[in-house]
């Protein structure tokens, strides 16, 4: 689990095949290696990846073909700089929100507006994903925990403070760029519970009417 608070900006140095459909993603980094162990989880632009090698200058991760297909890592036009966050430890403060590191979709940046020292960034997203986004709710953009300032059926806006804009790769984004999006997991749990509630209404099980209809 992650919190969406970025620790460091790294740079992708290579993606290479390890054989048997396994890929290795190597990121140049300086600080996240502190207390790192093989097998640790790190969110790389919001994607949970497993550490398979590291030294003082870089970290390598295992990358499945499916992850390559469903993320922007294989996009040559995508930024080579990435947000990095180590997995949350027991007892850490939850400064952002619960981020799993499972990307739901891509969103496209359509507008950036500077208002004083703050920034408003507008994105378009598939309506099937937008239904999980709520006003003033949380969303992870490239792994960054952000708050929804406005939304419609296929669009949302985030308001970004200067520190977040400067200390993450948000400042690198240009209109037309795509980003990884992970919606708040709580919305998906609510949807799942409601689905079961509807099933129970359609099939209520043993009721007084059921017993009467069966001669009891």
What are these regions (language model features)?
Residues 1-216:
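Conserved loop->alpha-helix
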């Amino acid at each position: 689990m992650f919190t969406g608070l970025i620790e460091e900006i790294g740079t992708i140095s290579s993606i290479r095949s390890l054989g048997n459909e396994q890929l290795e993603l190597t990121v140049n980094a300086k600080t996240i290696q502190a207390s790192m162990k093989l097998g640790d989880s790190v969110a790389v632009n919001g994607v949970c990846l497993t550490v398979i090698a590291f030294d003082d200058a870089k970290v390598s991760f295992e990358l499945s073909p499916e992850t390559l297909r469903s993320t922007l890592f294989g996009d040559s036009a995508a930024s080579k700089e990435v947000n990095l966050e180590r997995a949350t430890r027991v007892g850490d403060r939850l400064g952002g929100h619960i981020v799993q590191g499972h990307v739901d979709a891509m969103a496209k940046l359509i507008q950036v507006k500077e208002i004083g020292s703050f920034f408003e960034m507008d994105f378009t997203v598939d309506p099937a994903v937008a239904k999980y986004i709520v006003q003033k709710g949380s969303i992870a953009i490239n792994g960054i925990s952000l708050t929804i300032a406005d939304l419609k059926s296929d669009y949302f806006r985030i308001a970004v403070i200067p520190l977040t804009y400067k200390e993450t790769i948000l400042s690198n984004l240009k209109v037309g760029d795509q980003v990884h999006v992970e919606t708040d997991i709580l919305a998906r749990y609510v949807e799942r519970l409601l689905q079961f509630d509807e099933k129970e209404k359609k099939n209520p099980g043993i009721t007084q009417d059921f017993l009467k209809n069966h001669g009891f």
